[in-house]
């Protein structure tokens, strides 16, 4: 009997659903070996269909997106009940992702910015109550803060190699212990083709401000690259293409808190050409060139940021 698979999106952009195509022709072989039990982005699947399934009917549910609305929360709880395994698929489900940057603002601030002062909760004028949009939760949550998660396939979106690793393990019945993250333990720098020589930071520049040397380490050139604190597993796709790593595969086990670890790394690398106390003002000047520290260092992981707002709303 074929294993039953579910794929569901919550607060996401849709890129994770499209990412299955990155596997190429191999996805045809994967789909031939599973039964799609529930996948609204691919087939006409309703909540009622899911509710009618017995507990544990689905062998694995891959959920992408942050938990942003009450409906998201209800659906993932329902999927947890109906599934033997829950997989956090992609950076938003894993860490909170881009949607979690909204946690820096209170819910009322977000709604006012989007809809203006006249916005009120509920259905549009003249529409029935069932047409009301789902209630916005006070904060965007990673999947593990909503339901127990068994496995994680990280990335924005997950790279083809990691998708393949997951399905190889799943279809063979040789899954690793629960809690496993389908990515490397070592940092992305370990698989980056760029050459690191100076290991010092003499300046900070934004990617559009220079034409980077195609062979040299981006950090050595002053571009903030999160490769030192990010899990490997994507073959350093962004640095290989001339763009810095933004941390979408999540922190290495050693790094823990990605932002704090990267700040520590930058502080140890910065060199102003001075010694002792005379260097402090110039080193501060270099570090102050870091534009949008939160968006840079916690682009995908605001829920784990120690100083994030509570955002009650």
Can you annotate each of these PLM segments?
Residues 1-62, 72-73, 77-85, 104, ...:
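Iron-sulfur (Fe-S) cluster-binding modules
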Residues 66-68, 92-94, 158:
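Short glycine-rich anion-binding loops that position phosphate/pyrophosphate groups of nucleotides
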Residues 71-72, 96:
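Extracytoplasmic/secreted cell-surface and envelope-processing proteins
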Residues 92-99, 118-119:
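Short gly/pro/ser/thr-enriched loop/turn and capping motifs at secondary-structure boundaries
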């Amino acid at each position: 009997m074929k294993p039953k698979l579910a794929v569901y999106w919550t607060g996401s952009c849709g890129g994770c659903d499209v990412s299955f195509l990155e596997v190429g022709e191999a996805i045809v072989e994967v789909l031939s070996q599973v039964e799609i039990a529930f996948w609204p982005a691919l087939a006409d699947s309703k909540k009622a269909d899911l509710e009618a399934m017995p507990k544990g009917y689905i062998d694995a549910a891959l959920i992408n997106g942050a938990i942003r609305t009450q409906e998201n929360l209800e659906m993932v709880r329902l999927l947890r009940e109906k599934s033997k395994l829950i997989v956090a698929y992609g950076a938003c489900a894993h860490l909170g992702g881009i949607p979690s940057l909204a946690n820096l603002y209170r819910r009322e601030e977000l709604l006012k910015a989007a809809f203006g002062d006249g916005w009120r909760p509920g259905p549009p004028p003249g529409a029935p109550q069932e047409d009301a949009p789902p209630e916005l939760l006070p904060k965007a949550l990673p999947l593990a803060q909503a339901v127990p998660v068994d496995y994680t396939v990280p990335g924005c979106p997950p790279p083809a190699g990691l998708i393949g690793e997951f399905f190889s393990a799943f279809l063979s019945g040789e899954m690793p212990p629960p809690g496993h993250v389908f990515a490397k333990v070592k940092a992305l720098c370990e698989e980056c083709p760029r050459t690191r020589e100076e290991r010092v930071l003499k300046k900070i520049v934004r990617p559009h401000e220079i034409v980077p040397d195609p062979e040299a380490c981006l950090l050595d050139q002053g571009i903030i690259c999160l490769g030192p604190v990010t899990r490997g597993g994507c073959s350093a796709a962004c640095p290989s293409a001339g763009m810095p790593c933004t941390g979408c595969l999540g922190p290495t086990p050693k790094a823990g808190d990605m932002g704090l670890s990267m700040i520590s790394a930058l502080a140890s690398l910065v060199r102003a050409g001075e010694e002792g106390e005379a260097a402090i003002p110039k080193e501060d000047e270099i570090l102050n060139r870091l534009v949008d520290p939160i968006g840079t260092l916690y682009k995908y992981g605001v829920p784990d940021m120690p100083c994030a707002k509570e955002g009650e709303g």
